[in-house]
Amino acid sequence: MKHLSLLLSFIFLTSACSEKPHKEKYEANWESLKQYTVPEWWKDMKFGIYFHWGPYSVPAYKEWYSHWMYEDGNKIREYHEKTYGNLKDFGYKDFIPMFTAEKFNADEWAKLFKDAGAQFAGPVAEHSDGFAMWDSELTEWNSAKMGPKKDIVKLMADAVRKQGMKYIITYHRHWLYAWYPTWDKSTDAGDPKYAGLYGPYVPKGSFKMGEKVPTAYPDDKFNQEWLDRLNELMDKYEPDIIWFDNKMNIIGEKYRMLFLANFYNNAEKWGKEVVCTYKAKDMAEGSAVLDLERSRMSEMKPFPWLTDDSIDWDSWCYIDAARYKTTNRLIDFLVDVVSKNGAVLLNINPKANGEIPSETKERLLQMGQWLKLNGEAIYGTRTWNVYGEGPQKIVEGHLSEFKNSEAVAQDIRFTQKNGQLYAIALDWPEDGKLTIKTLKKGNPYINNFESVSMLGCNDNLEFNQSDEGLVVTFPTEKPCDYAFVLKIN
C-alpha cells in the first residue's frame, strides 16, 4: 500500500509539472492584437461624455496652462507672474492645494450625463500635467492624497455604473515627457524634489507638439512608469473603455503593445468585452478603435470610429471666457457622425470647486430632451447605403471642426435599425416641404413607400415621390427645436 501511494504521488507530481502554463489569448505584438474585434455593444454606443478637470482648472485659463506658464514670452506666463508671482515661488504644484472640489458630487454628475442621453462617461484619469486623479500607490501626486483628497476615478466609476452607463477613462501621461522645463533651475520645475510631478530631467528644446518628431524620446524608466500607472488603473477600476490622447507614439512600441495585450487579456478574465481608442498611427490599424480630435469624417466608413470634441470652442477645461457651442451645433454634429458609423465623446468643463457651469448643464439637458424624443434614430443604429445628402461639405483633418459650416434643412442624414429607415433633416425647411433627392423615382435603394412620419408627431405626413426626390410635407408645428427625424416605411 505504501509503494502504491508513492507511485500515485509520483504520477501526480509528474503530471502537474508537465502541465503547460495557461496561454493568454492576446500576445504583445500587432499581429496578435489585430485579432481583436469591436464588441457589438460599442457599435450601439453613439454618445459619451467626459471631462477635463484638475489643478489646471484653478487658474481657469485653458488646460495647457501648466505648460505655457513656463514658456518665455507666452501671454499665460505673463498672466501667471502678474497674478501669482515668479515661477520659483509659485509653480504649477502650488495650484494643487487650491483644487479643493468642495462642491463635487459624483452621483449628481453621473445623473446629469445620463439625463443628457450619454451611454458612456468618465474622467480624464491623468492629463499632461502628471497629476493622477485616483488613489495611486505609484505616486504621491494624486487627488486622494492632495487637493480634493478624493479618489475621483473610483467615485465616478461607481456613480457612472450606478446609472447603467459604460465607464471610460482617458489617459494623457505620454504628453508629460518634456511638458515642463525640468532643465530650468530658475523655476520649481527644475527642482529634483518635484520630479514625481514634473517628470524626469530633459534637455532644453526637448518638447515638441504631437505631430512633430521629438529631439529626444522617453527612456525605459519613463515608459515603464507610463505602463505601470495604466496597469494600476486597470486593476483597480476595470474600465470598459480606455481612451488615449495623441502623441502616444513617443512611448516605446513594446510598451504600447504590452498595455493593449494586458487590457484585452484582463477583459477575458473580467468576463466582459472592452474598447481601447487611439489617434493617428499610435496603434496598428485594426488593433483598437480609431479616434479623431475636434474633427469628423467626410464620408461613411466601414469600421466604427470615435471623435472627441469639447463643448467650448476654445478650451477643454473651464475658462472664464468660454465660447460655448450651441445645442443645435452639438446635435447636428452628433447626427452627422452617427450617419457615418461614428460615435461622439463630448468633453465638458467643470469648475475647480466641482460645479458644472450652468451653460454646460443647459446644453446637456437640451441634448437629452432631443435624444429622449429622437433616440430611436441614433442609439443602436447602423449606417444605411449612403450617409446623407446636402450642400454641407465636411473638412477632414486634425482640429478641422473649426472650418465646418452650419448645416441647413437640405442637409439630410440617414440611419437605419431593424429594417427601419430614418432621414434626419438638420434644419426645418422654410416652405414646410423637404425634398429627399436620394429617394427620387428610380433610385437604387427603395421605391415602395407606405408611410412617412416624424418622431414626436402623431399623424403620418403627406409625401410624393417625383423625379426630383421624395417630397415630404412637414407638420404645422415643430416637435422639437433641433434636427427633425422622418421615419420612412
Q: What are the residue ranges of the model-derived segments?
A:
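Bacterial Sec-dependent N-terminal signal peptides
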Residues: M1-H22
